[in-house]
Amino acid sequence: MVSRIEDVAQAAGVSTATVSRALRGLPKVSDSTRAKVLKAAADLQYVASPTASSLASGKTHVVGVVVPYVTRWYFAHLISGASEVLREQGFHVLLFDVGDEGPHRALLLDSRMLFKRVDAVLILSLRLHDAERELLRRLNVPVVTVGVPDDDWPCVRIDDYETTRQATEHLIGLGHRHIGYVGGDTVPSMDFPTPADRARGFRETMQRHGLTVSAHSVVMGDWTAVSGREVGRELLARPDRPTAVVAASDELALGVLAAARELGLAVPADVSVIGIDDHEMADLNGLTTVAQPVVEQGRMATQLLLSAVAGHDLGHEVATVPTRLVVRSSTAAPPASAAAVAEPVRASAR
């Protein structure tokens, strides 16, 4: 027989209203009373009806999280940070993994969001289409984005341009003049701004120092270590290979490290490698990187979102989270022979 809230109230010796408040973690319930209610609910294996709770409060305590890829490192860590805050505050996650849905993406969101009501929506590193914007306006719930600034909603992000500027400046400061770049391809249906911003940070930093970026010193992968290994081999097997490589992510950089080993190149004696992110595997592999606090970005964005759910007006604030250079063993000065023939470097204007 399924237990009812009345059964819990009778067992705990309190009213049904007190049971409801105690189970929802609301104030004005003493610790001893809350403990009695929780014990009675556990003994009776009582499960509160989410439908009834939402009807009473007008809230579902569900937050929709829209993400392009669930399994990739960056997105998984954003979700981890968001889930941690939501769990602490008694909210549940409704995950929308849009993958490579392309033109069907808006339909996927529409069919799931409208029929499974959410109190707010968190958008993770995704530029929204017009149809998706209209859907969110119709839902009339708070929205916060991560990674992609938006004119309509608050955003938590890093400065992607700055990450590759920091990485490139580090290598130039060590004396490197012939620097290659391993970038991440843009998925057309996703329209990520990150690939272009990071590539621009590399190119413009090189230009400010008067250094050449040749066409064959830039290769593109798909953000994975496997891809980094493939394009890294292409870059490092050239007779005029670079003495250092900036990779647009740590996973790409880890692939470049593997490619260097396979080609018999010593890191950093023959080639220096730097990534971006501070992936857990970066430390294990001695990878120098520009670290970004991914889990913390997920936490910050979710805290903003719940503040909006509570009625606070957030405006269109953009919170830019700082990144930092973490120097490990994968970067050093170039070989003496390379340094001797290197082109002169201009001081950066920045």
Segments (PLM) and residue ranges:
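Short beta-strand segments enriched in small/hydrophobic residues
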Residues: 18-20, 56-71, 170, 178-188
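Periplasmic-binding protein-like
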Residues: 65, 115-124, 180-182, 218, ...
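Flexible loop/turn connectors
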Residues: 232-350
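Hinge/beta->alpha junction and helix N-cap segments in small-molecule ligand-binding domains
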Residues: 68-77, 96-105, 156-166, 182-233, ...
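Alpha-helical recognition/docking segments in bacterial nutrient-uptake
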Residues: 3, 62-169, 173, 350
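N-terminal helix-turn-helix DNA-binding module of bacterial transcription factors
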Residues: 1-61, 74, 335-350
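Short acidic capping loops at alpha-helix termini that bridge into adjacent secondary structure
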Residues: 177-178, 213-217, 267-272
